Structures are given as structure tokens and as C-alpha cells.
Amino acid sequence: MNSIPEGRPTPNLPRTANKRGVARLAAVQALYQMDVAGTGVMEVVAEYEAFRLGKEVDGTQYLDADPQWFRAIVAGVVEDQLKLDPMIHQALTEDWPLSRLDSTLRAILRAGAWELKARKDVPTAVIVSEYVDIAKAFYTEDEPKLVNAVLDRLALVIRGESRGAKPRHKS
């Protein structure tokens, strides 16, 4: 994983992004910052909107994002985290509890889970694909596959639809 000063994760070069895709990526970075630095939701949203989204930061040009989408994801994850985390935990394998995942992966899964739950207007395949792409921007190993499997299981539980995964059954 690449990083810039202050420990914020930065993605590898992604494919051409749309404004919602950029908002998703920024939301994951903001959620990471909140998790690692203990930054509050109002503070992190204000910082991203004032200094990051569509701006140049340390020689890197941030793309324009849909600010309402960004705010909705960040605020929604914060508001629903106590409901989302147990759902994510159930979708993980028993030997990988949510607490064992790094902050970036937790942020990706929380944002994806929130979107599956709250944004019924967005197709499941779009949500899963977008967050798998975000995972690919940060990771080169098995993490994107994990994101795909977990979000697919969550889609089955939340929406009753899936792209192929089966729900995890306890033995």
C-alpha cells in the first residue's frame, strides 16, 4: 500500500473514474483517517471538501467527486457502524474477524456494506465492482477477492441477491 504524509492511504493508479467512484474512494480514505487518527466526521468531511476533493495536494491532483455521495457514505457508515460491523463479521470467515483486518480494508467493507444497505437504487454489481476496484488500488494480494466475497455475501443477506457467493454457515 502506498502512503502519503500523515499516514493516509493512497491508491495505485486507478482506471478512469466517475464522480461517484471518486467519492467512494475519498470516503474510504476519510473513514481510514477517522479510524486511525480518531478524526470526527464533521472535521474529516470539511477537510476533504475544502482541501482534497478536486484539489492538488502535495503535487497530486485529486479528481472531482460527487460531494453529496461522499458525505452520504461517510456519515452513513458512522451512523450505522454498530449495525454494519456485525453484518460484516458474519460475512467474514471465522478465522478472520473484523478486528483482524487493517483499517483500509475495514473502511472499504464498511463503505460497501453501507451502500448495499442504504442505496437500493444502485445495482449490487456496481457497488461490489466499485469497492473491489478500490481494493485493487490499495492491495495486490488477496484483499480484492476478500472484498468481493464479503460484499457478495452481504448483498445476499441485505438484498436477497448475489453475484455467486454463498452465505457463510456456522458449523
UniProtKB/Swiss-Prot annotation:
UniProt record, GO biological process: DNA-templated transcription termination; transcription antitermination
UniProt record similarity statement: Belongs to the NusB family.
InterPro entries in alphabetical order: NusB-like_sf, NusB_fam, NusB_RsmB_TIM44
Gene3D superfamilies xref list: NusB-like
Protein name: Transcription antitermination protein NusB
Described function: Involved in transcription antitermination. Required for transcription of ribosomal RNA (rRNA) genes. Binds specifically to the boxA antiterminator sequence of the ribosomal RNA (rrn) operons.
Source organism, top-level taxon: Bacteria
Molecular function, one GO term: RNA binding
Classification via Pfam families: NusB
HAMAP family: NusB
Keywords: RNA-binding, Transcription, Transcription antitermination, Transcription regulation
GO cellular component, one term: cytosol
Keyword Isomerase attributed: no
